[in-house]
C-alpha cells in the first residue's frame, strides 16, 4: 500500500489524485482510495488540515497525490450586504459551526435548523453539492486553532 506522509510546501506535478470530504481531510491517520482505484494510507502530522489543491507525497518522494475537495451537501448563503453576512457569521460562530467564508457567500454543512434561523434574519439559504473548505479554526488542533485562555478582562462560557 502507498503511504502518504507529507504535504509538500511547493507542490509538484501530481501523479495521482484523491477526492476527500472535509471529515476525512482533517484526519491524520486514515485509509483512502485514490481516484485511480489504488489504496493509500495517510500518515500525516496531527492537526494538519488538507485543502483542495494540496499535494501529498510518500517518504521516498516518488508519488505525488493531489487532494481534491469533494462535493458535499452544504447550505449556501449569498448576500451583497456585508452587515447581514457578518450577522450570520456571528450566530453560526456562536454555535461553533464549521464555516466557509467568501466575499458575498457563506457555506456550512447542510442543517435545516440553521437554515431556518438564517431565513428568519431575511437571508436566502439554498442547498448545494459543492466543495466545502471551512475556516481552519473549526478543525485545527489546539496548537493551530482558537485558544480558550481566559484573561481577567475577557471571559465567555461554553
From Swiss-Prot:
Keywords linked to the UniProt accession: Chaperone, Cytoplasm, Nickel, Nickel insertion
SMART domains per record: UreE_N
GO terms for biological process, alphabetical: protein folding; protein-containing complex assembly; urea metabolic process
Compartment(s) of residence: Cytoplasm
CDD domains: UreE
GO molecular function per UniProt: nickel cation binding; unfolded protein binding
Gene3D superfamilies: Urease metallochaperone UreE, N-terminal domain, UreE, C-terminal domain
Domain of life according to the entry: Bacteria
GO cellular component labels: cytoplasm
Primary role: Involved in urease metallocenter assembly. Binds nickel. Probably functions as a nickel donor during metallocenter assembly.
Family that this chain belongs to: Belongs to the UreE family.
HAMAP family documented for this protein: UreE
Protein name per the record: Urease accessory protein UreE
Organism (species): Klebsiella pneumoniae subsp. pneumoniae (strain ATCC 700721 / MGH 78578)
Gene coding for it: ureE
Amino acid at each position: 500500500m502507498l503511504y502518504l506522509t507529507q504535504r509538500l510546501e511547493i507542490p509538484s506535478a501530481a501523479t495521482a489524485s484523491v477526492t476527500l470530504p472535509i471529515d476525512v481531510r482533517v484526519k491524520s491517520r486514515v485509509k483512502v482510495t485514490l481516484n485511480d482505484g489504488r489504496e493509500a494510507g495517510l500518515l500525516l502530522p496531527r492537526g494538519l488540515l488538507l485543502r483542495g489543491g494540496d499535494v501529498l507525497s510518500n517518504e521516498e518522494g516518488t508519488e505525488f497525490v493531489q487532494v481534491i475537495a469533494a462535493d458535499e451537501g452544504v447550505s449556501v448563503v449569498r448576500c451583497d450586504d456585508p452587515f447581514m453576512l457578518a450577522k450570520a457569521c456571528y450566530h453560526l460562530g456562536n454555535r461553533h459551526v464549521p464555516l466557509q467564508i467568501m466575499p458575498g457567500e457563506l457555506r456550512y454543512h447542510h442543517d435545516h435548523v440553521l437554515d431556518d434561523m438564517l431565513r428568519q434574519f431575511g437571508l436566502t439559504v439554498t442547498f448545494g453539492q459543492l466543495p466545502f473548505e471551512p475556516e481552519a479554526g473549526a478543525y485545527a488542533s489546539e496548537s493551530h486553532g482558537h485558544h480558550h485562555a481566559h484573561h481577567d478582562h475577557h471571559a465567555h462560557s461554553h
